[in-house]
């Protein structure tokens, strides 16, 4: 659990990635039994699945399929936003720290750079769930 950002009990997390090692890395980082992880490989239906599964947060790989993580992030946020709520928070998994601008542009609530530690992922999740201002969490951040 990240200091300063207590995670709510029982968070349902939709993991959108089409590569097994990315899914495995997210699962390995999120070992807290308070997390319920739901894997989803089709980026085109991620927003509908997030709503159907009543997800609290969506974790999206930037390199997911042909659609890409930016488009998935926008799709989830657009499908879940209301006049008083900016939409379901998304944690974007980046390949390089220089891709932070992509996460900001897509409207991600938080992001981490692969490979990431369990602490970095928990911190990003906590920020997203608490709807904090976007802020990078990256192992190679300068």
Placement of each model-derived feature along the sequence:
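C-terminal output helix
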Residues: 116-125
